[in-house]
Curated annotation (Swiss-Prot):
Family: Belongs to the ferrochelatase family.
Entry superkingdom: Bacteria
PROSITE patterns (UniProt xref): FERROCHELATASE
InterPro entries per UniProt: Ferrochelatase, Ferrochelatase_AS, Ferrochelatase_C, Ferrochelatase_N
Pfam families assigned to the protein according to its UniProt record, in alphabetical order: Ferrochelatase
Name this polypeptide is given: Ferrochelatase
Physiological role: Catalyzes the ferrous insertion into protoporphyrin IX.
This protein's pathway: Porphyrin-containing compound metabolism; protoheme biosynthesis; protoheme from protoporphyrin-IX: step 1/1
Species of the source: Bordetella parapertussis (strain 12822 / ATCC BAA-587 / NCTC 13253)
Localization annotation: Cytoplasm
Binding site for Fe cation: 228, 309
GO biological process, alphabetically ordered: heme biosynthetic process
Enzyme Commission number(s) of this protein: 4.98.1.1
Amino acid sequence: MFLRLFKYLWPERYLPEIPAQDPFDENPPPCGPGRVGVLLVNLGTPDEPTRGAIRRYLGEFLSDPRVIEIPRYLWMPILHGLVLAMRPKKLAPRYAGIWMEEGSPLLVYSQRQAAGVRQGLAARGVHAEVELAMRYGKPSIPAAITALRERGCDHILAVPLYPQYAASTTATVVDAVTRHAGRLRDQPALRFVKRFHNDPAYVEAQAGRIAEFWQAHGRPQKLVMSFHGLPRYSIELGDPYYRDCLDTARLLRERLGLREDEVEVTFQSRFGSARWLEPYTEPTLAELARQGVTEVDVVCPGFVADCLETLEEISQECRDAFVAAGGRQFRYIPALNDCPPWIEGLTDLVERQLRGWPTGNP
């Protein structure tokens, strides 16, 4: 407070440097409509597969009240006293096992998606700047918005890369984007993509990914569609995530021409002791094996880029559970990643959402 008062008493000394274009110029250059920016946002990842980097990432992720919806005074001692003290040690070798030469798979594939959308929009004559951000970790949302603003973007479309809406994923991206944009003196116009769980471009790309895999490797007895889990209380409080997942599963099943008994919908990545969405993926796979199912394929339609939850939890842990229970053939169908149909579909989605904004010649 004293420092602020001090600055008001001697304002000239503390004024920021006046920009080259005088804001009080009586004859300013004509002001155009500005440029359009696209902000693709995924969850985030540690910078490297080390305990320290994982601890920093988890600390930011699990401190978000949208993610852990219990009182702060109860959760923060648990987070700092137990979770951050123990979890990084367990996760470090798991991250190391999936790490790519270029870095974290989630970051690498997300960067390729951003590059693909940038090129795709340009090829269609849509002039838009494209940036990638992570909700937790780097590149951060504030840094990405700053980069777009520095390139003259006064319209920003934020695209959370979560097909199914959840408060703990999509809504927290909206929170972060609006929080940072709200601090700007010259605020950009904002739009958000809420969900795309039933978008034809997404469904077609995901179904095509499965069909292409089967064309190369043959079809199994069962297809398991595993979505990230949520605590049941999230749904009871009004979160539409569960319904979105079922809609996606139905659309994919119909597009692939499968009967209901050929598909299982499950939920993975349970955290803590609360009851989460069921059935759980790993026990379901073990039970299928005990029932005599020897061949399963698992796809994760909620993940548009491969990450720890798909490459380690599904492809390794769930495989082990299925085989240990008597299963013979377990195959994980990779996420959409940077496959051309998905890049094309994501570009379609972005282009549609930009309608009405100045995307012509800059």
